Swiss-Prot record:
It catalyses: (2R)-2-phosphoglycerate = phosphoenolpyruvate + H2O. Its main location: cytoplasm. Its cofactor is Mg(2+). InterPro entries: Enolase (IPR000941), Enolase-like_C_sf (IPR036849), Enolase-like_N (IPR029017), Enolase_C (IPR020810), Enolase_CS (IPR020809), Enolase_N (IPR020811). Binds a second Mg(2+) ion via substrate during catalysis. This is Enolase. It comes from Parafrankia sp. (strain EAN1pec).
């Protein structure tokens, strides 16, 4: 297999107008791999650390230090490594950084290199990325968890829950699921206009109206599903990303204007699950509220998927603790939370071995890079979260999944309702 011959990097812009890192790796056979690194708005305290410049330039968010780290430190250290030696490459990156949170060189620098090398190796092998990473059996297309209504840190409104998602579980193919989602998205816009509500969009393409309660958001989505001609529950399920760490402080959750305990939050979620066909709730409790997580998993874990994002930060060590303590039953997978492809794959493998579901995810600050679409198929996630069917940095991932489904042809399988074995018919 060709070895690494050249490594370059540059500062580019993400979908929120903030700088991010793009890395290019060239192999000795001339093959090029390019990867751009995403960035989050609501970030977990235990995520790997992005290296930012500080100062006045780009409001302190420049990434020239990370670019310099790629060119000056990382590139020389990995030159002549074989591109297929992903685990060795990533171990070299981790050792070179030498800090637990990857703060010396920056997780944004390390991840860009890690992904660019994988893409170069795939191209050199003559394989699409999903096939190179997943092998000959990779064929499962994920259910798109479309964030069509935004609140929380993704929108400047008084809606506490960060993401209200639709899951087209009744579709027969990924292409059909995407069409259903797009039709519901347009129907929701019409419903909002009819109510005199704002139709501006948040970071991830979902609408961001100011609403009196979080339930109102669910009711508007239910109306849009009906308006588009689909059935709530059988055709389209609902999902939430609460991002509750964002409103947790001093042991209390400030939610809909009042302080609530973990048990009161769990009561609230139980009522929602009783009232709506909700198949997944992400980060219902805060990243350090382990007791609360164990409690909600005991109470609701048999009925609904409980996804750890800030709780696990795609970190195998934190996931192992959650498995041991019975906290959550699914892992959100964000490659930039951990900083290398190998560590991401290790977290996914641990989740699968332990009976935890996995949901591949974008970040609120995205680029046109489509790596996560291939990765979702490669590791049999069965679920992907990459925003509304709008904004080109979101649609890029969906379009890549369309291409993958077309390439797989008769071998392609759409995960559908099977991605949510805990699903009930409530709603």
């Amino acid at each position: 297999m060709p070895s690494i011959e050249a490594v370059g990097a540059r500062e580019i812009l993400d979908s929120r107008g903030n700088p991010t890192v793009e890395v290019e790796v060239v192999l000795e056979d001339g093959t090029l791999g390019r990867a751009a690194v995403p960035s989050g708005a609501s970030t977990g305290a235990f995520e790997a650390v992005e290296l930012r410049d500080g100062g006045d330039r780009y409001g302190g968010k420049g990434v020239t230090k990370a670019v310099e780290a790629v060119i000056g430190r990382i590139g020389p250290a990995i030159m002549e490594l074989e591109a297929t030696e992903q685990r060795l490459l990533d171990a070299t990156l981790i050792d070179l950084d030498g800090t637990p949170g990857k703060s010396a060189l920056g997780a944004n620098a390390l991840l860009g290199v890690s992904l660019a090398v994988a893409k170069a190796a795939a191209a050199s092998s003559g394989l699409p990325l999903f096939r190179y990473l997943g092998g000959p059996s990779a064929h499962l297309l994920p259910v798109p968890m479309m964030n069509i209504l935004n609140g929380g840190a993704h929108a400047d409104t008084n809606v506490d829950i960060q993401e209200f998602m639709i899951a087209p579980i009744g579709a027969g193919t990924f292409a059909e699921s995407l069409r259903w989602g797009a039709e519901i998205y347009q129907a929701l816009k019409s419903v909002l206009k009819g109510r005199g509500l704002a139709t501006g969009v948040g970071d991830e393409g979902g609408f961001a109206p100011s609403l009196p309660t979080n339930r109102e958001a669910l009711d508007l989505i239910a109306e849009a599903i009906d308006k588009a001609g689909f059935g709530l529950g059988d055709d389209i399920a609902l999902a939430l990303d609460v991002a509750s760490t964002e409103f947790f402080a001093d042991g209390s959750y400030t939610f809909e204007g009042s302080g609530r305990s973990a048990e009161q939050m769990i009561d609230y979620y139980a009522d929602l699950v009783d009232s709506y066909p909700i198949v997944s709730i992400e980060d219902p409790l805060a990243e350090d509220d382990w007791a609360g997580w164990t409690s909600i998993t005991t109470r609701l874990g048999a009925r609904v998927q409980l996804v750890g994002d800030d709780l696990f930060v795609t970190n195998p060590e934190r996931l192992a603790r959650g498995i041991a303590e019975g906290a959550a039953n699914a892992l959100l997978v964000k490659v930039n939370q951990i900083g290398t492809l190998t560590e991401t794959l290790d977290a996914v493998n641990l989740a699968h071995r332990s009976g935890y579901r996995c949901m591949m995810s974008h970040r609120s600050g995205e680029t046109e890079d489509t790596t996560i679409a291939d990765l979702a198929v490669a590791v049999d996630c069965g679920q992907i979260k990459t925003g509304a069917p709008a904004r080109s940095e979101r649609v890029a991932k969906y379009n890549q999944l369309l291409r993958i489904e077309e390439e797989l042809d008769d071998a392609a399988r759409y995960a559908g309702a099977g991605a949510f074995p805990r699903r009930t018919t409530t709603g």
